[in-house]
């Protein structure tokens, strides 16, 4: 079995894309350590080369520690993230709901990420996952004008004023975008 990454060039809705399919990272009891180390290095390289990463979770197993580690790596490398849960064709609605709850519970820190249920076997929702990954990349690269950010801050302060600090209300003056992928903002007070 090859453990190398496969690069596939294709066009989707007038966009040139490269899909990097990496070998799955498996549980320790099921692995040949040398081959697995090679696979992990290739997966890390693929994350570094990517604008957007789709983490494919096996719906029969649920989210594993390896999945959580990979998601952490994607976020640490500041890449857009989409999660796909495979085996939609083999799971009952009840099982899918339980997996969704498990994912939302274990990934509270990434509640902004799209989670899509798919079937690699029947190809169900595959284009939905691709669209989610492209949208996530587009959003992560977006820049917002300072005036819009400042207006948003003003509206937020008006509807829900900041707390007092040492008897004085915290004042938020303006904000600007400090970077993208991921978008970062600096608020001045």
What kind of feature is each model-predicted range?
Residues 1-20, 28-41, 45, 49-56, ...:
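C-terminal-of-GTPase-core extension/linker across diverse P-loop GTPases
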């Amino acid at each position: 079995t090859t453990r190398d990454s496969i690069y596939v060039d294709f066009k989707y809705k007038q966009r040139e894309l490269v899909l990097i399919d990496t070998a799955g990272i498996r549980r320790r009891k099921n692995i040949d350590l040398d081959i697995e180390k090679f696979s992990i290095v290739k997966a890390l390289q693929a994350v570094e080369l990517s604008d957007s990463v789709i983490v494919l979770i096996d719906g029969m197993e649920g989210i594993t520690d390896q999945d959580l580690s990979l998601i952490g790596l994607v976020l640490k490398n500041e890449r857009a993230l989409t999660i796909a849960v495979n085996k939609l064709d083999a799971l009952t609605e009840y099982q899918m709901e339980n997996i969704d709850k498990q994912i939302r519970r274990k990934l509270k820190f990434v509640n902004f990420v799209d989670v899509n249920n798919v079937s690699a076997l029947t190809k169900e929702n595959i284009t939905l996952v691709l669209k989610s990954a492209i949208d996530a990349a587009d959003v992560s690269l977006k820049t917002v004008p300072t005036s819009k950010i400042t207006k948003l801050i003003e509206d937020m302060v008006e509807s829900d004023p900041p707390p007092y600090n040492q008897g004085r209300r915290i004042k938020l003056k303006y904000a600007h975008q400090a970077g993208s992928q991921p978008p970062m903002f600096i608020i001045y007070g």
